[in-house]
Amino acid sequence: MAVPAASSIVSYGGAATSNFLTTPVTPFLAGFYNSNFVTDRINSCAPYRVDRIRKQLQDEEENGYPPADDRRRGALFCRSGTWLEMLPIENPDDGSTRVKVHGTKEESSKFSIVEFVSVAMSLVSIRGVETKNFICMDPSGKLYATPSSNYSTECVFLEEMMENYYNLYASCAYGDRFNPWYIELRRSGKPRRGPNSKKRRKASHFLVVHHDLDRLRSPVPNGNDVTDLVVASLFHQPPSHPLFRQQTVTKPPNPHRISNLRAKVEMTNQAEKQRLLEEKKRRREKKKRRREDRLRKEEQIREARRQELKSLREEELRRRYQQQQQQQASTQTRYNRPQNPANPYPTYRPLPTRSTVQSPRPAYNPYWQSPVTQAPHHNSHHHHHHHPRVSSSSDPQQRHQSQQHYLAQTVSNPNRQNVNYQRYP
């Protein structure tokens, strides 16, 4: 996507150090870049390339050698709405100057123009054109700027192109393949540390704006309107945004209160205006009268409620007074009752005894044995052995002695004392 502008030739998207591509990286190349072969080759060749680039830059600055032709210049626009800038700041105490890496809203800042130095396949370094400093990332993930004499592997970043033509720049020295440390700029312009960066966050997406300054007679830094070229990426608005809306489609006028008021203000007929004012005054008076009626009715309801509560309170007090009078009358009647002087104290009368007096329970007899119950003899049964017949005597004294045999038993205890024991009945 190459769009000519009035003041410069600008190309949007694509890789920073490679030739401009009109389409994103194919899946084959994406897999090739992520393969172990390419990764191992980059890790083995990057230190050597870094040393060679440092010597080349020193020769350019000290001996005046011409710069390399493969370097592209441009600017990095963050999707959060800021331009990557390397601003020199002078310290008033000692007079030293340091370069601050941050994001700026100024589109025409000359400190936002950078050049991309190719280190290896998909490895680039970002250098400010005005400050001659490289953007680096320290072990804590903080961005800083360093001169060409201190150029190291911390100044090398892995460039990755996404499907939406935005680029990601991850630190080559720190982080890993699964948790890379990206360059991120907040909406306020403050950079975020590498360990806290995310791939899918807008603050880590950068749009490469290339400037072919050699072809321009009067180069203007960032002399273009980015909003006219990549509206969808910069505004992050749905298709209902005015820049996406078709100009040929016009909506019918929708009358509402504001349009009615505007028509009343623009009215030139004084008689009509006076009529509208009188009608408005009548509506205001009617509204005021209705409000007064409503307040009057509410006051009447409140007064009726107060009278009802007052009558209920008086009735409750009257009822309590009557109860108190009744209690006093009953108490006076009890005190006025005559006493019996013949027998002022009641005589003591013992409790009536029970008619059936039970005898005390005998002591427990551990040697007591239950009487042997003889099996009944049935005349109808014929056994092989003969049971001795019990002589049935008609003497009641003899029958009583036979029954007393089972009530008491004579048992010899360890003390050799024959005592009659009885078990609990």
From Swiss-Prot:
Record's protein name: Protein let-756
Topology versus the membrane: Peripheral membrane protein
Keyword hit for Nucleotide-binding: no
Molecular function via GO: fibroblast growth factor receptor binding; growth factor activity; protein kinase binding; RNA polymerase II-specific DNA-binding transcription factor binding
Gene that this polypeptide is encoded by: let-756
Record function comment: Required for larval development. Probably by binding receptor egl-15, negatively regulates membrane protrusion from body wall muscles during larval development.
Record SUPFAM superfamilies: Cytokine
UniProt keyword annotations, A-Z: Developmental protein, Growth factor, Membrane, Nucleus
Domain of life: Eukaryota
Quaternary data: Interacts with pal-1.
Listed GO biological process terms: fibroblast growth factor receptor signaling pathway; negative regulation of cell projection organization; nematode larval development; neurogenesis; positive regulation of cell population proliferation; positive regulation of MAPK cascade; regulation of axon extension involved in axon guidance; regulation of cell migration
